[in-house]
C-alpha cells in the first residue's frame, strides 16, 4: 500500500509540475502577443504596434485662434520695443476639417502617445482609432542604431552628403526626419542642414524669424515641415495647439504652456531673432515650436504632407508612427537578418532617389543654359556639388541564408567613385 501510494504521489507531483509549466508558458505567450515586444532582452513595447489604452476623447473645437491672438504677445512686443504690427481683420477662424486624418498627440507620466484614425470621406473609407506609444530614448534602441550605423558607415555618409547639399526629394527628407531622435549627432546635424534648405527653398512663405530659427536649431525639427499658416492656438487652453486643414487635423499637447516666460531667451542670439519679427504671429510661432518639445516627435508629419502635396501618389504610408515598416529594425536588439536587410534596401532606394533627383535637376539646368531666354526666370541658381564617394557595399553583412538573390543597379541611381565611374550597388532581396 505504501509503495502504491508513493507511486501515485510521485506521478501527481510530476503532472502538477508539468501543468504549472504549461500554464506559465501560455500566460507568457498571451502577454507577448498582447504587448508585441520589440526587444526580447528588456521586453520593451514595440512602438510600431498599436496598444490598448484607456479611452481618451479627441478635443472638439468649432473655432481656432490665429497665433497673433495669444494674449501676452502685445505686451512682450512693447517690452522688446518691436515695431507695431498690422493686425488681421479677425483672430478666430472656423474649424474647416471635414474628413481625413484626425489625431491627438498627448503625454502622461509614462511617455508620449499618438491617437489617430481616419474619418469617413465621401467614398465611405475610414480607419478605426489606434493608439501608439512613442519610445523616445531606450538603451536597446541606441544599441540597435549603433549596430546599423557601424556595419554600413559609407552608406550613411553618402546620405549625409546628399542632405547637406540639398539634393534630395521630399520623401527622403520626411523618412529620415521621422527617425531624427534615434540618430547620432552627426546625422542630426545633416538633417538640420536639409530642413534649413527646405525652409529657404520650399516656397511655403516662411518668414525671416522662421528661417533664423532653423539656423539656430530651435525647437522640434518635424514642426518646421508644417506650413506655419496651418498652425492655430486654442482659446480654451495654452497647453495645446492644432494643425488643421480640410482633410487633416491634429491636436498636439505642448510640453510647456504657451506663455511668455517659456520663450527661450537663454539661446544665444534669440533677442536678435525676435527683432526680425514681421508680425505677432512670428512671436506665437517661435513660442510654439519651442514649447512643443519632444511631443513633436509623435506628430504624423508624413500624413500631413501627403494630404497637402500627395507625395505618395494616392497611396497610404506603410506605417503610422514612422514612414516605412522596415524602420522597425531600430527597435530590435539585435535586429533580425530580414529586418536589417529591409532597412538597408530602403536606405539604398533613398540614395537612388537622391541620385535621380540630382540628375533631373542638372538636366533642367542644362536646358536653361542652352536656352538663354529662360535664364532670367531663375533668380538664384543652386550650386550643385558632387556628392561624396561611396564604396560598393552589401547591405547585410551577416553570413546567413537571408541573402539569396542580388540585383545589381547600373543606372543613373548608382553612386560614382573618385574617377566618376558608376559603382554597382547590390540590392539585397532576402529569402521568403
UniProtKB/Swiss-Prot annotation:
Record's GO cellular component terms: cell cortex
Record keywords, A-Z: Cytoplasm, Meiosis
Primary location recorded for the protein, binned into one broad class: cytoplasm
BP-aspect Gene Ontology terms: meiotic cell cycle
Subcellular compartments: Cytoplasm, Cell cortex
Family annotation (InterPro entries): Meiotic_expression
Protein task: Has a role in meiosis.
Assigned protein family: Belongs to the UPF0300 family.
Protein name: Meiotically up-regulated gene 134 protein
